[in-house]
């Protein structure tokens, strides 16, 4: 039996930002560690919407993942949680 490790990509995050908060971003801009969610116009409620969508999609609780300030940090934390099964 093989275990598939799921990774949320910057492209997927950009799509979720559009869906959850109506914020359109270039996925390449999300890769820059210096850019914070606020720089893209995404507030905490929009980020919670993204977390909720990911929790539903992957059937995993992502507690405290909404506290990340940048997209890159968010992806690192979420992908780490998905890889570990946490």
UniProtKB/Swiss-Prot annotation:
Q: Which PROSITE patterns match?
A: CARRIER, PHOSPHOPANTETHEINE
Does Ligase appear among the keywords?
no
PTMs per UniProt: 4'-phosphopantetheine is transferred from CoA to a specific serine of the apo-ACP-like protein.
Q: In which pathway does it act?
A: Antibiotic biosynthesis; curamycin biosynthesis
Q: Name one GO biological process term.
A: antibiotic biosynthetic process
What InterPro entries does the entry give? ACP-like_sf, PP-bd_ACP, Ppantetheine_attach_site
Q: Which residues form the Carrier domain?
A: 7-86
Signal peptide span per the entry? none
Residue positions, PTM O-(pantetheine 4'-phosphoryl)serine:
44
Arranged from A to Z, the UniProt key words for this protein are: Antibiotic biosynthesis, Phosphopantetheine, Phosphoprotein
Q: Does the keyword Phosphoprotein feature in the UniProt annotation? A: yes
Q: Which Pfam families has this protein been placed in?
A: PP-binding
Q: What does this protein do?
A: Acyl carrier protein.
The protein's name: Curamycin polyketide synthase acyl carrier protein
């Amino acid at each position: 039996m093989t275990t598939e490790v799921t990774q949320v990509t910057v492209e997927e995050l950009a799509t979720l930002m559009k869906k959850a908060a109506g914020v359109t971003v270039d996925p390449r801009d999300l890769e820059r560690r210096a850019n914070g969610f606020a720089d893209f116009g995404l507030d905490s409620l929009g980020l919670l919407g993204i977390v909720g969508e990911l929790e539903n999609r992957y059937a995993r609780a992502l507690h405290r993942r909404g506290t990340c300030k940048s997209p890159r940090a968010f992806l690192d934390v979420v992908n780490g949680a998905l890889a570990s099964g946490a």
